[in-house]
Amino acid sequence: MAENQYYGTGRRKSSAARVFIKPGSGEIVINKRSLDVYFGRPTSRMVVKQPLELVELTEKLDLYITVSGGGISGQAGAIRHGITRALMEYDETLRPALRAAGYVTRDARCVERKKVGLRKARRKPQFSKR
Protein backbone atom coordinates (compact mmCIF):
# COMPACT_ATOMS: atom_id res chain seq x y z
CA MET A 1 0.00 0.00 0.00
CA ALA A 2 1.25 3.46 -0.90
CA GLU A 3 1.68 5.93 1.96
CA ASN A 4 0.03 8.79 0.01
CA GLN A 5 -3.18 6.92 -0.79
CA TYR A 6 -6.63 8.21 0.11
CA TYR A 7 -9.77 6.13 0.57
CA GLY A 8 -13.52 6.70 0.29
CA THR A 9 -16.56 4.42 0.46
CA GLY A 10 -19.60 5.23 -1.65
CA ARG A 11 -23.07 3.70 -1.70
CA ARG A 12 -26.12 4.07 -3.94
CA LYS A 13 -29.23 1.84 -4.13
CA SER A 14 -27.79 -1.65 -3.45
CA SER A 15 -24.27 -0.90 -4.76
CA ALA A 16 -21.14 -0.25 -2.71
CA ALA A 17 -17.85 1.13 -4.05
CA ARG A 18 -14.40 1.34 -2.47
CA VAL A 19 -12.28 4.10 -4.02
CA PHE A 20 -8.51 4.52 -3.60
CA ILE A 21 -6.94 7.76 -4.86
CA LYS A 22 -3.23 8.47 -5.33
CA PRO A 23 -1.31 11.10 -7.32
CA GLY A 24 -0.75 10.00 -10.91
CA SER A 25 -1.70 10.56 -14.54
CA GLY A 26 -5.51 10.32 -14.45
CA GLU A 27 -5.94 6.56 -14.89
CA ILE A 28 -9.27 5.11 -13.66
CA VAL A 29 -9.42 1.35 -13.00
CA ILE A 30 -12.73 -0.25 -11.97
CA ASN A 31 -12.66 -3.95 -10.95
CA LYS A 32 -9.33 -4.36 -12.84
CA ARG A 33 -10.84 -2.87 -16.04
CA SER A 34 -10.61 0.62 -17.50
CA LEU A 35 -13.51 3.06 -17.16
CA ASP A 36 -14.39 2.84 -20.88
CA VAL A 37 -14.47 -0.97 -20.82
CA TYR A 38 -16.45 -1.25 -17.56
CA PHE A 39 -19.11 1.35 -18.41
CA GLY A 40 -20.35 1.16 -21.99
CA ARG A 41 -22.87 3.99 -21.56
CA PRO A 42 -21.45 7.53 -21.86
CA THR A 43 -23.84 8.77 -19.14
CA SER A 44 -22.36 6.37 -16.56
CA ARG A 45 -18.82 7.46 -17.49
CA MET A 46 -19.87 11.10 -17.15
CA VAL A 47 -21.38 10.46 -13.68
CA VAL A 48 -18.13 8.83 -12.50
CA LYS A 49 -15.99 11.75 -13.75
CA GLN A 50 -18.22 14.56 -12.39
CA PRO A 51 -16.46 15.17 -9.03
CA LEU A 52 -12.99 15.08 -10.63
CA GLU A 53 -14.00 17.55 -13.36
CA LEU A 54 -15.59 19.86 -10.78
CA VAL A 55 -12.34 20.20 -8.79
CA GLU A 56 -10.17 20.01 -11.95
CA LEU A 57 -8.06 17.02 -10.84
CA THR A 58 -8.90 14.67 -13.74
CA GLU A 59 -5.30 14.40 -15.01
CA LYS A 60 -3.57 14.54 -11.60
CA LEU A 61 -4.98 11.52 -9.75
CA ASP A 62 -5.07 7.76 -10.36
CA LEU A 63 -8.17 5.92 -9.13
CA TYR A 64 -8.39 2.25 -8.20
CA ILE A 65 -12.01 1.24 -7.59
CA THR A 66 -13.78 -1.96 -6.56
CA VAL A 67 -17.56 -1.94 -6.84
CA SER A 68 -20.16 -4.63 -6.17
CA GLY A 69 -23.92 -5.04 -6.12
CA GLY A 70 -26.72 -3.35 -8.01
CA GLY A 71 -26.85 -2.33 -11.65
CA ILE A 72 -25.04 0.10 -13.92
CA SER A 73 -26.72 3.28 -12.67
CA GLY A 74 -26.38 2.35 -8.98
CA GLN A 75 -22.72 1.42 -9.39
CA ALA A 76 -21.94 4.69 -11.18
CA GLY A 77 -23.64 6.63 -8.37
CA ALA A 78 -21.78 4.64 -5.70
CA ILE A 79 -18.45 5.31 -7.43
CA ARG A 80 -19.22 9.05 -7.64
CA HIS A 81 -20.04 9.11 -3.90
CA GLY A 82 -16.83 7.20 -3.09
CA ILE A 83 -14.67 9.49 -5.25
CA THR A 84 -16.20 12.51 -3.50
CA ARG A 85 -15.38 11.12 -0.05
CA ALA A 86 -11.83 10.21 -1.10
CA LEU A 87 -11.30 13.72 -2.56
CA MET A 88 -12.41 15.25 0.75
CA GLU A 89 -9.87 13.07 2.57
CA TYR A 90 -7.24 14.13 -0.01
CA ASP A 91 -7.99 17.86 0.40
CA GLU A 92 -10.60 19.15 2.89
CA THR A 93 -10.81 22.54 1.10
CA LEU A 94 -12.67 20.81 -1.77
CA ARG A 95 -15.66 20.03 0.50
CA PRO A 96 -17.67 23.28 -0.06
CA ALA A 97 -17.51 22.97 -3.87
CA LEU A 98 -18.47 19.28 -3.76
CA ARG A 99 -21.26 20.02 -1.26
CA ALA A 100 -22.66 22.81 -3.48
CA ALA A 101 -22.75 20.42 -6.45
CA GLY A 102 -24.64 17.88 -4.31
CA TYR A 103 -22.07 15.06 -4.46
CA VAL A 104 -21.41 14.77 -0.70
CA THR A 105 -24.97 13.76 0.24
CA ARG A 106 -25.74 10.04 0.02
CA ASP A 107 -28.76 9.52 -2.26
CA ALA A 108 -31.10 7.62 0.08
CA ARG A 109 -33.65 6.65 -2.59
CA CYS A 110 -34.02 2.91 -3.03
CA VAL A 111 -36.64 0.46 -4.31
CA GLU A 112 -39.89 0.46 -2.37
CA ARG A 113 -40.90 -2.98 -1.14
CA LYS A 114 -43.82 -4.92 -2.60
CA LYS A 115 -46.85 -5.01 -0.29
CA VAL A 116 -49.13 -7.99 0.39
CA GLY A 117 -52.38 -7.80 -1.57
CA LEU A 118 -50.91 -5.49 -4.23
CA ARG A 119 -49.34 -6.41 -7.56
CA LYS A 120 -46.30 -4.17 -7.09
CA ALA A 121 -45.26 -1.62 -4.45
CA ARG A 122 -48.27 0.62 -5.20
CA ARG A 123 -50.04 -1.00 -8.18
CA LYS A 124 -53.41 -2.30 -7.05
CA PRO A 125 -55.20 -5.27 -8.64
CA GLN A 126 -57.59 -4.38 -11.43
CA PHE A 127 -61.04 -3.41 -10.14
CA SER A 128 -64.11 -4.96 -11.73
CA LYS A 129 -67.47 -3.33 -11.08
CA ARG A 130 -69.44 -6.40 -12.25
Swiss-Prot record:
Protein's name in the database: Small ribosomal subunit protein uS9
InterPro entries, per the entry: Ribosomal_Su5_D2-typ_SF (IPR020568), Ribosomal_uS9 (IPR000754), Ribosomal_uS9_bac/plastid (IPR023035), Ribosomal_uS9_CS (IPR020574), Ribsml_uS5_D2-typ_fold_subgr (IPR014721)
Superkingdom assignment: Bacteria
GO molecular function terms noted in the UniProt entry: RNA binding; structural constituent of ribosome
PANTHER family, A to Z: RIBOSOMAL PROTEIN S9, SMALL RIBOSOMAL SUBUNIT PROTEIN US9M
Lineage start: Bacteria, Pseudomonadati, Pseudomonadota, Gammaproteobacteria, Vibrionales
The entry's keywords: Ribonucleoprotein, Ribosomal protein
Similarity comment text for this entry: Belongs to the universal ribosomal protein uS9 family.
NCBIfam families per UniProt: PRK00132.1
One GO term (biological process): translation
Pfam family, one: Ribosomal_S9
Natural source organism: Vibrio atlanticus (strain LGP32)
Record GO cellular component, one term: cytosolic small ribosomal subunit
